[in-house]
Amino acid sequence: MAFGKQTYDGSGKEMRESLLSILKDVSPNEDNYFVSNLGVGSAATQKTHEWNLYFADRATSVDPEIEGAETSYPDLTVETRSSNSTVILDAPVKLSRTRASIAMVSGEDAMGVEKERALKALKSEMEYATVNGSYAAGSSGVARQMAGIDYCITTNVTAWGSARSFTETDLNDIIQTSWDKVGASYVIDVIAAPVVIKRRVAGFGTNLTRNVQAEDKKLTQEVRVYDSEVGQTVKVIAHKDVLKTAGTLTVLGLREDHFEHSFLVNTGEPHWEDRAKSGDFEAGVYITEFTLVSYDERASVKTTGWLSGL
C-alpha cells in the first residue's frame, strides 16, 4: 500500500540526524586539590630552586650554670639548604585547518574546545606531579623531574608489613607523630588519602563534622573535618592520585602551608604558546615550568600498606 514517505524507507537519508548538542565530559581531570589550594612561593630563577631550613631540637635535659661562671658559647645550629628541580609539563593541541574550521557538535569552536581540554589535562598532570613526582636532575636528552609530596616525606614514614585496617586510633597516631616532631602550631592539618580511607573516617563517630569554612572549601567536593585527640583539627580529603593499589595504599598527613609551588621566573606559569606553522594546520601548546617547595617535611607523615577495602 502506497504511503507517500515514512521514516523506514530510503527517505531517512533526507532527514537531519538527531545529534544532541550537549557533550558531557566526565573525565576525572578537575579533582586537583593541591594545584587549587597550595600557595605560590617566590619565583624559581633557575632550574634548581633552593631554600633554607632551620630546625633546633627541644631541650631534653637541664644544664645549670654555677655562680660566677664565665659564659660558655655552644656551637649554634646551622641552617640547612633544600632544593628541588623544576619540571616542564605541556599539553599540545594540533588540528588540521579543515578540522579547526568545522564547529563541534555543540556548536563551539573546535580549537577553543581542544584548548580548554588541554588546559584541564595540564592541571591534572601538575597535580599528579605534585603528589607523586620522582626527583631527577635531568641531562642532555633526559627530562628533569621534580620531587612530589610523597617523595619529599622521609622522616615520618611507616610501611605496614601486611594490609592493615585503618582505624580512628591510627588516625590519631598519625597526628601525634607530627605533634611529637614539631611545634604545636605546625602539626599536620590535612589528611590526603584514597577514597576508601575517607569512607572509613566517616564512621569514626562524634569527633567528625562536615562543616568547613567557606574560604577553605575551594573545591566542590565534600571535605570532612576531624577533631583529633591531640587537639589538632584536620581536613580529610579523598584524593585520586595518592597511591591506592593493594600493598602500597598510602595515607599522607600534611601541613598544607609547608608546601608551595614555585614557577620559573617570567615564563613558568601555565600559558598558551602558538607553534610555528609548517603545514596546513593550527597548533600550539599549554606549557608550564614549576617545582614543589617543601619547607620542612618532618611536620608531615606518610604511612603505607593499608587495607584497600572496607
Model feature map: region roles:
Residues M1-L310:
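Flexible, glycine/threonine- and acidic-rich loop/arm segments that mediate assembly and lattice contacts
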